[in-house]
Amino acid sequence: MKNAFTLLFETIKERKRNPLSESYTNYLFLKGEDKILKKIGEECSEVIIASKNNDKEELVKEMVDVLYHCFVLLVEKNISLEDIMEEVTERNGKLSRVGDRREIDTL
């Protein structure tokens, strides 16, 4: 049985291959990368607001929106879910020390 992420990703790929005129996913593909990136930015802002408001239910919904739009971008850029999973697997379990990370100085 496939997980929800895989099913969503495959549905988005199918919309790219076989567009449906009333599909929001199709609309994003027609508008192109700039529109997709704009939506990712908007949804990330909504994640921040939901988190700052301590609204767990809204935060979950907005995170799903971010993931959906990121999946649309991955399909647009011809990056597979397997590519992402390989990178996650490679990073998983690696020892990472705070000193190995860039300083975050914009806060």
From Swiss-Prot:
Q: Do you know which Pfam families this protein is assigned to?
A: PRA-PH (PF01503)
Q: Does the keyword Aminoacyl-tRNA synthetase apply?
A: no
An annotated GO BP? L-histidine biosynthetic process
Disulfide cysteine pairs (residue numbers): none
Q: Which reaction does it catalyse?
A: 1-(5-phospho-beta-D-ribosyl)-ATP + H2O = 1-(5-phospho-beta-D-ribosyl)-5'-AMP + diphosphate + H(+)
Q: Which UniProt keywords apply?
A: Amino-acid biosynthesis, ATP-binding, Cytoplasm, Histidine biosynthesis, Hydrolase, Nucleotide-binding
Gene Ontology annotations for the cellular component aspect, listed alphabetically:
cytoplasm
Which GO molecular function, any one, fits this protein according to its record?
phosphoribosyl-ATP diphosphatase activity
Known pathway: Amino-acid biosynthesis; L-histidine biosynthesis; L-histidine from 5-phospho-alpha-D-ribose 1-diphosphate: step 2/9
Which InterPro entries does the annotation name?
A: HisE (IPR008179), PRib-ATP_PPHydrolase-like (IPR021130)
Matching entries from NCBIfam families are given as:
histidine_hisI (TIGR03188)
Q: What's the family?
A: Belongs to the PRA-PH family.
Protein name per UniProt: Phosphoribosyl-ATP pyrophosphatase
**Species for this entry:** Bacillus cereus (strain Q1)
